Amino acid sequence: MKVVLMGTPDFVVPIFDEIARRHDVLAVFTRAPKPVGRKHIITKSPVHIWAESHGLPVYHKPSEYNFKPDMVFVAAYGAILRDNVLNSAPCVNLHPSLLPRYRGPSPIRTAIKNGDAESGVCLMKMTNELDAGDILMCKKFDIDIDDTNETVEEKVSKIGADMILEDMAAPEKFPPVPQSGKIVYTAKTGVYDEIIDWKKSPIEIHNLVRAFGAGRKKINGTDVKILKTKMNGDRLEIITIQPAGRRPMDWKSFVNGLHGTEVKFGE
């Protein structure tokens, strides 16, 4: 099968790799390189790097699309497809939630932050409307109490690869079904979402840290990132912390560095 791939982040790469092993990839569309970090180093997306390592042509602008594949497969591409793409071939999107719950750009982080114990992966037909296409297939998986964005992405990669290969092998087995149920949208996330409110419950703070990989706040007047936590019954334990301008350390080392000063969790 001739296929065009569209995607950007890390968790998409294993899925694209499985497709490329079995099918003819005509082109890969991904986010253009952009400045990253404090030094604003121009950085290619994980999918861009993967495509180049496999000698596959890489494109960034929808206006560059001029292909006639048997399928367009999309996963976390970050943009709604234009009609020239939608009309060129069947377009299938992998979305990491149980649609129509958590449409939009941050379904995994939102599920973890909300403390959901279950999520899923859906394959759907692409339309002009955001994540609103008919469903071809959905599979559920559990979100454990200590799962993070990264570990859930690993689950999505494995399940998603199996799903798209199954669909490509026998698409007639998966007729499209309209989405049903309550529609819930997610929003783009940023540094502001990582700010901890100490008035929240221990489990809510734990969920925030594992959703975003860091919780930001002041402790004893110092800006810190709380990188890892765990629940001990109803209590929250801080495992790894990173004071501003320093390397990550365990909580005990941080407290020892206060030399007996009382730990004060600031606003």
What are these regions (language model features)?
Residues 1-38:
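N-terminal Rossmann-like dinucleotide-binding module
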Residues 1-3, 51-54:
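Catalytic cores of RNA-modifying enzymes
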Residues 8-11, 62-64, 77-80:
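Short beta->alpha connector loops
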Residues 21, 54, 69-185:
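Donor/substrate-binding cores of folate-linked one-carbon enzymes
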Residues 28-31, 51, 61, 94, ...:
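Generic beta-sheet signal
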Residues 32-52:
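N-terminal beta-loop-helix "entrance" segment that forms/cooperates
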Residues 58-67, 231-233:
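Short acidic low-complexity segments
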Residues 180-267:
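Internal anion-binding site segments
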